[in-house]
From Swiss-Prot:
It comes from Verminephrobacter eiseniae (strain EF01-2). Catalyzes the hydroxylation of 2-nonaprenyl-3-methyl-6-methoxy-1,4-benzoquinol during ubiquinone biosynthesis. Keywords: Cell membrane, Iron, Membrane, Metal-binding, Monooxygenase, Oxidoreductase, Ubiquinone biosynthesis. Its EC number is 1.14.99.60. Its main location: membrane. HAMAP family: COQ7. Belongs to the COQ7 family. InterPro entries: COQ7_proteobact, Ferritin-like, Ferritin-like_SF, Ubq_synth_Coq7. It catalyses: a 5-methoxy-2-methyl-3-(all-trans-polyprenyl)benzene-1,4-diol + AH2 + O2 = a 3-demethylubiquinol + A + H2O. It is found in: Cell membrane. GO terms for cellular component: plasma membrane. This is 3-demethoxyubiquinol 3-hydroxylase. GO terms for biological process: ubiquinone biosynthetic process. It comes from the Bacteria.
Length: 208
């Protein structure tokens, strides 16, 4: 893929992620359970948590798109593109949950996308194994974050819980695949900086 083709593909992905309603290749896990009756406070909490999870999927699209655009390894590009396609399902599922809960997406989605895209470009520029290291660390942190949401979501909101549980399993698998592909372990200061940035994003997206 030429640099121009990569740029066009990245721009197309950004527009689709930010402004189009995503379509899932696989049915949402929420479809298998009944919608619960939540009181207003429970609905607000579930909506806020699913908005945060939707932001995470916006960032995943940006990260994978940037890394796939710069790698010269065709096999790695194919793996990144496949992971991005799977994350589109997550993007669609979280958007569906937001709609069902009467909640909106984050107003700062373009900012989150741009930041994650820049991070992906930097990681890819350093090298493929570092790029895979960012994937492994990001997915591991996201999986831990999703586990915390399973503890916070209303117990009766089985639809949101089903989506989050499936996403957690997928993120853990993506992290394991990145490590198996030769991901470098990132230095502790980098991991700490990523966690700090994630905390800022999640605390902001909870409300905005």
């Amino acid at each position: 893929m030429s640099p121009a083709d990569s740029l066009l593909a990245a721009a197309d992905n950004a527009l689709r992620t930010l402004f189009a309603k995503p379509g899932a290749a696989e049915k949402s896990p929420a479809d298998a359970v009944a919608e619960a009756a939540l009181d207003p406070a429970e609905k607000r909490l579930a909506g806020a948590l699913m908005r945060v999870n939707h932001v995470g999927e916006v960032c995943a699209q940006a990260l994978y798109t940037a890394q796939a655009a710069l790698t010269r390894d065709a096999r790695l590009r194919a793996r990144l593109q496949q992971a991005a396609r799977e994350e589109i399902d997550h993007l669609a599922w979280t958007r569906q949950r937001l709609d069902a809960l009467g909640a909106r997406t984050s107003l700062l989605d373009p900012l989150w996308f741009a930041g994650a895209f820049a991070l992906g470009l930097v990681a890819a520029k350093v090298g493929d194994r570092v790029s895979l290291g960012f994937v492994a660390e990001t997915e591991s942190q996201v999986a831990a974050h999703l586990q915390s949401h399973l503890q916070r979501l209303p117990q009766q909101d089985l639809a949101s819980r089903a989506v989050v549980a499936r996403m957690k399993d997928d993120e853990e698998r993506h992290a394991a695949q990145a490590r198996a592909s030769g991901a470098l372990a990132l230095p502790a200061p980098v991991r700490a900086a990523m966690k700090a940035a994630a905390r800022l994003m999640t605390s902001t997206a909870h409300y905005v």
